[in-house]
Amino acid sequence: VFQKGAFRSGYYRDQTFMMAINELTLKQLFSGLYANTDINEEPMSAGRQMGAHFSTVSLNEDGSWKDLINQRNSSSDVSCTGSQMPRLLGLAQASKLYRKLKTKNKNKFSVNGNEVAWGTIGNASTSEGVFFEVLNAAGVHQVPMVISIWDDDYGISVENKDQTIKQSISEALSGFQRNSKKDGFEILTVNGWDYPNLINTYQKANDISREKHIPIIVHVKELTQPIGHSTSGSHERYKSKERLDWEKKNDCNLKMREWILDNKIAIQSELEVIENDSKEIVKNAKKDAWQTYLNPIINSRKNLIPILNDLSEEFNKYNLD
């Protein structure tokens, strides 16, 4: 549903999104982690930003515009949570204007304003003021944007009950829901482990927003974390045993596996081969990215050592002891 010409405005959890639209490879992901300064190896920021800060290139090397309607686009991520929201609104507003106004030279930028702006945000960041400001403006202007709210019931260690009224952002925003008399948002909810309904939900979201320029909220619930918020954290410290047991049973990857088996799309042995091969692919990408990062350093060191040796010999000629 993320079609050519569309724009993403997300945050630093969207590596799967970027790989799905073929704008990120595993090697590039690890090159970002290693802060490789070679723009060809780390095209997102040449090592200047924290890992998983994504973008796509909008300009050719000569400074002219690329044909944006024939590529999948992403605005450049920044680290402040919630900061993707104003950019999301602006990108959606651009499509609105392209449909409304008869502008010149729009061939590379829009096809009748059909381009949807796709946003992503974590449930905890929906407590920020900028989130509500943007939703209000998007509802007033009726712009084509789809905002996905990834909800794992926690904001790092803080539960929804301690930060979100009604413990549900979609329920809290229910007054934004459009009806037959007044414009507003279309609010959709779906569980993150429910693959068929995810497909149906996002297809519906895209069709409504693209054709009618109606903003959409997709509240994706019951997401799980395989580990804590970061590799240095431990969710065992703030989640109950009951919650952790529930997450093990409802892990999205596990649920996807069950769905594949239940629908006889593949058998157990085939999935095991895929899983094992996938692990090897990731390991090899990691090694390749690390070696590519090290090679220029190793070569520079090799070139420097003879120079230092020559300097040492030259210095010793003067016998300055």
What would you call each of these model-derived segments?
Residues 1-6, 221, 225-228, 232-321:
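Conserved acidic/glycine
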Residues 1-148, 155, 159-177:
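Cofactor-binding active-site loop characterized by glycine-rich and histidine/acidic residues
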Residues 15-19, 126-127, 153-157, 196-198, ...:
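Flexible loop/turn segments at secondary-structure boundaries
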Residues 99, 109-115, 166-204, 248-277:
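Conserved thiamine diphosphate
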Residues 131-134, 200-207:
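Glycine-rich, charged/polar anion/phosphate-binding loops
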Residues 207-214:
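Long, amphipathic alpha-helical stalk/connector segments used for oligomerization, subunit docking
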